[in-house]
Structure formats: structure tokens, C-alpha cells
Amino acid sequence: MRLLRALLRSASSGSIPQQVDFYSRFSPSPLSMKQFLDFGSENACEKTSFMFLRQELPVRLANIMKEISLLPDNLLRTPSVQLVQSWYVQSLQEILDFKDKSSEDLEAVHSFTDTVIKIRNRHNDVIPTMAQGAIEYKESFGIDPVTSQNVQYFLDRFYMSRISIRMLLNQHSLLFGGKNNPAHPKHIGSIDPSCNVVEVIRDGYESAKILCDLYYMSSPELILEELNVKSPGQPMQVVYVPSHLYHMVFELFKVCNAMRATMEHNADRCIYPPIHVHVTLGNEDLTVKMSDRGGGVPMRKIDRLFNYMYSTAPRPRVETSRATPLAGFGYGLPISRLYAQYFQGDLKLYSLEGYGTDAVIYIKALSTDSIERLPVYNKAAWKHYKANHEADDWCVPSSEPKDMTTFRSI
């Protein structure tokens, strides 16, 4: 709280609250994957990126900052949420410092790139810190269905906004930060124009296999089948961000999902059915289906797997630097779904209780169709936080059947 107040006081000359009000009136400008590629082509211009980001970043920051202010007061008072707010205030102020700088001032342009890198690093722990705030709130005040629904709505939008802001920061810093990536010379920033989907899936499997072997002393094998309908016989390639795809498949593979379920469901038999992955590339979609025989989950629990407030894992320690990112928060699946949805794809789960689960990732096959999905602060969003959620308009079954012998007709 003190840090946030100090930042607001130090920024009073720049009227940060007024700037947030001003920039939140504008809608973010979603970019397609093709536009990201054009920005980072051989003719990439740092000045052009500078002029775009100094306008776009305040809009994206301000839009989500307005939504943060609509959270329950007790959640806003948690130390973790206060810390996240302070990061956003500080980052917005630093971007606004370049509002009146000339794009012809090379020193200012280079200084902007340094600032972008600093902001990117500052926001490294936004996701686990906000998650910690949700845990602090839940432990202190409990959670009711209405608050849970509002927090779920907010966190989906907040984390999607964070993914989009980080994408802009990464692209600019990787392209103009002066450090080339020798391991991926053909990447344009964080984007691979010819992302080999099968290779990324195998990388995700191998990483998850290491964890599974360490914990269970064994692991299910991978059976991968691919079908390129678009270009038969050719490698399965799309324009995509490999780190996003890796995050999704690793999360689905790793110990807390397909591998763990398979190992624990078949522990008595000591025979571990393989995990089947089918990859297809059509004219519109690239689809990855992962199937395990880990026993599945009941239909009523599917939605809970994507609920931020539902996690039953022990409270993690954010300050433990060696911990796996998001370990213990139960955020792996909901964040993975946001990565899929970010460029107009999706991630869905289909479960057969007693048998296993199918997870399906949808990705747009064309770079022109892969367009950012961005939250915008407007009247509809405001109403969602302020609306009174009334009783369900469908009858709710009671836990005990009605005794019809005592029933009287009207």
C-alpha cells in the first residue's frame, strides 16, 4: 500500500489517474501474426516500433488498470495486488515519459528500448504475484459464487492482457535490444515463421518425461501421428510463437495432467498405456489432440480445472526462485487456454470418466487469421463487475429426492 501511494504521489505531476482515464477510452489495436512479421522483417524500423508502442502500450495498460480498480476492496488491499498495481503505475509513467519525444531523436529511441526491456523484466512475476493475491484474499475472507465468478472473469482478461503486453515488449526488445539469438537465427523476435509443430511437441514431451521419471521412476511413452492435409508429405509448419505452444503441450503432458494421471491410474498394473498425440494441419486450423488413459474426471469437474480460485494445491512460496513457474497455483491449464485463445485458437478438454481424457489445442493455420484477442474496458465490462447476479432461472436439484407420498397437489 505504501509503495503504491508513493508512486501515485511521485506521479502526481503527470496525473497518472487522469492519464489512465484518458487512455482507457481508447480500444487496444489487435495485431495479426502477419503484422508482427512485417514489423520484424529485414526492413524493421526501430522508429516505427517506437511510435506505435508509445501509443499502444499506455492504451493496453490503462484498459486493464481500470478493471483492476473494479475488484473487491479487500482483494485490492492484499499486499500482492498492491505490488502488481505499483508495477503497472510505474511502467505507465515510464512509457508516458516518451510521449512528446521525437522519433528523430535517436538517443530517445534507444532509451525507449532500454525502458521496454526494464518494464519487461519488472513484469516477469506478474502472474504468480497476482495469483498470490487471490490466495491471500481467499484465505482471509473466503469466496462466494458471485465473487468467484467476477474474479474468474477478471483474471482471464488480466492474464490475456499481460500476454499481449509481454508480446509487444518481447518483440521490440528482441528485435532492437542489440542481442541476437544464435540458437534461433530465423526467428523474428519470438515468432518462428516456420514453426515445426511436431518438434515443439516432442520437446514438451521430453521435458515432462524427465519430471515424470524423477517422481515415478517411469513414464508413459509417446505415440505421435501427423496428417498434413494442406500439404501432404510436407513438415507440419505454421507461423507461431514456439514458447506459447511449448507452454501448452508441456502443461498437458507434465506430471499434473496426462502423465501423472496415466501413472497413478495404472499404478497397480505397472503397465502404463502410451499417450497418443494426433496433429493435423488443414486449410484453416492446426489441431493437436492429446489422449491419455489416466482415468478421466467427472463432467462436473471439467470447468473447475480452469477455475483460478479452485486450486486445492498447497500454498506455494513465490519468493522461492528455483520453484517451477506457477507450481502449486493450479494455473497451468487456464493460462494454457489463454495462450491458445490469444491468437484466436482454443484449448478444450473432453473426458471419459473411468477411461481417460482428450485435450485438444486449436491454432489458426494462416498468419492473417491469427489476430490478437484483447480485452477492452467499456460499459459492458464495467456492468459485468457491477451486476447483481440473481438466482438461477433453472431449477436446482435437491440432494434428497422428494417424498411423493406426502406430496399434495394444489
Explain the meaning of each model-derived region.
Residues 16-226, 234-246:
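Signal-transmission coiled-coils
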Residues 244-255:
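Conserved N-box helix within the HATPase_c
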Residues 291-298, 310:
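Glycine-rich acidic phosphate-binding loop
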Residues 184-192, 233, 272-279, 342, ...:
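Structured cytosolic regulatory/catalytic domains appended to multi-pass membrane proteins
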Residues 223-227, 262-265:
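Cytosolic nucleotide-binding catalytic cores of signal-transduction proteins
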Residues 2-48, 60, 69-75, 99-103, ...:
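Flexible, glycine-/charge-rich segments associated with ATP-binding catalytic modules
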Residues 218, 241, 255-293, 319-321, ...:
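ATP-lid-like helix-loop hinge signature
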